[in-house]
Amino acid sequence: IRTGLIGFLTALIAVLLIVFFRKRAIALMVILAMVLLWWGRFPAGDWDLFICDVGQGDGYVINLHDHRAIVIDVGPDPGLIDQCLRRLRVTTISLLILTHPHADHVAGISGARKGRRVEAEWIGNIAAGSTATIGEYSIKVLWPLQVGAIDENPNNVSIAAVIKSRDLTLFAAGDVEPAVQEKLRGQIGRVDIYKVAHHGSRFQDLTLMRELAPTLALVSVGEGNSYGHPAQST
């Protein structure tokens, strides 16, 4: 997700070239276009949220600038998450949130740590009511209810949190199932972005989804996965 700063700067530079160089403007604009095409292969510095291609799993990166980021889950493949973070030029993970101990969310951990400093890590050591402020983002944990929570279904001990900045509100809930989603009703309100629980499976609490009323709903899945994610009903 980007803000379009590159497009604005491109137009501004083009106008300045025409005004000040005239005859050389066309040649210079061609060179500029080639540079921008090359530059465009890499994420702009003004992006807020990036979804890593980790296959059937989750891997989300929130930009803190200066090569720092918040990372939510790391997918199943160390190589894929490492490749993504290198592409984004992330050298410091200010907060690594591993929502729950399933391979499609945590097995890539060695790749995320490779050559990077991890300043704080949440997995099973955080509970509802906990808060943090990292850069311009505030984070409020809504689930699980206690540290070290245990459930016969590990999905239901996923870390669920609201992450806010001045311009963005994101709700991410790992793989929590409807029984937990119901308990989160009335605690969140409207959000800009909802990281849909459990890869958009058919097990969703529609009342919560209506309360969230997200502008953008994100689902991370592997192409042709055997789980039927995302469900058509979702």
What are these regions (language model features)?
Residues 1-234:
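Non-globular, low-confidence helical/coil segments that flank catalytic cores
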